[in-house]
Amino acid sequence: MTQNDLMSELKQQALVDINEANDAQALQEVKVKYLGKKGSVSALMKNMKDLPNEEKPAYGQKVNELRQTIQSELDERQKLIKEEKLNQQLSEETIDVTLPSRHIEIGSKHPLTRTVEEIEDLFLGLGYEIVDGYEVEQDYYNFEALNLPKSHPARDMQDSFYITEEILMRTHTSPVQARTMEKRKGQGPVKIICPGKVYRRDSDDATHSHQFTQIEGLVVDKNIKMSDLKGTLELVAKKLFGADREIRLRPSYFPFTEPSVEVDVSCFKCKGQGCNVCKHTGWIEILGAGMVHPNVLEMAGFDSKEYSGFAFGMGPDRIAMLKYGIEDIRHFYTNDVRFLDQFKAVEDRGEQ
């Protein structure tokens, strides 16, 4: 058998073996059999030493052509095997596009966030500026700048989280008011609300939390009167609780305001007739307020004979509890999805 016949037979056998290889492993074995260092094609190259010199170039060219042919067939077969494997995998993992998709849970705004944003939008519409402040505050701005010197007995009204002797977690957002007035350097007007978290050493129960949200408001200008405060609070009550709400002012005491009042709104559930929400009084307490104490104005650099003002503070937690019928303030902070899911329907309806 001549060398040409041997190469032709080898080529035919290689093509048969390649076509019979059904996976990558079998194809690799065929490649080693023919093109490996000890393979059939490599053996042909070794025979070249026995040929006359004038025949070696032509023989070497034919062997290389055979190698290229086998390699080309191997590449094509490998490509085909990959395609068959992919098609089989796709067939096994067929997705029925007619089936309904998996339900994806969509969140909604927290009831406290909704309430705070509603209050902020209300006061923005009245021309107020929203001002943020520090939650870790100096004792001076938390107490002394608000007419509460170190010896003042009213400090006992608020148990505080002290970090050092002069640094504490703020017990109200009033320090933001003091700092804002100080920055204005005695020049009015000042018209701000201060939303934020506050901290007090209360034992957590259905109506108390060591951390809660507060929004305080401050207006300072010339000729600000108690009637301005009352008119503002009436508008706020009607916007938050309904147009038919009424308010009443009860005398109270706050060191930073004089006079000071507690503000009640007529019960929106019983219309003032008496029920469990208002404890059968017909009224619900919603905030504290008063005219800014002259000492507070003076300490902030305002002339109390020229300027006057009013301040108020409300708890969005309590307002949200009243609006949504929530009986335990702790529900706001436990992140219970079952509780929060109830407010999706409210948001979908676009209700406040």
From Swiss-Prot:
Chloroplast is among the record's keywords: no
Cofactor: Mg(2+)
Chemical reaction(s) catalysed: tRNA(Phe) + L-phenylalanine + ATP = L-phenylalanyl-tRNA(Phe) + AMP + diphosphate + H(+)
Subcellular location: Cytoplasm
Cofactor remark from the record: Binds 2 magnesium ions per tetramer.
One GO BP: phenylalanyl-tRNA aminoacylation
Binding site for Mg(2+): E258
Enzyme Commission number(s) of this protein: 6.1.1.20
Family of the protein in this entry: Belongs to the class-II aminoacyl-tRNA synthetase family. Phe-tRNA synthetase alpha subunit type 1 subfamily.
Subunit structure: Tetramer of two alpha and two beta subunits.
Protein name as it appears in the record: Phenylalanine--tRNA ligase alpha subunit
Taxonomic path: Bacteria, Bacillati, Bacillota, Bacilli, Bacillales
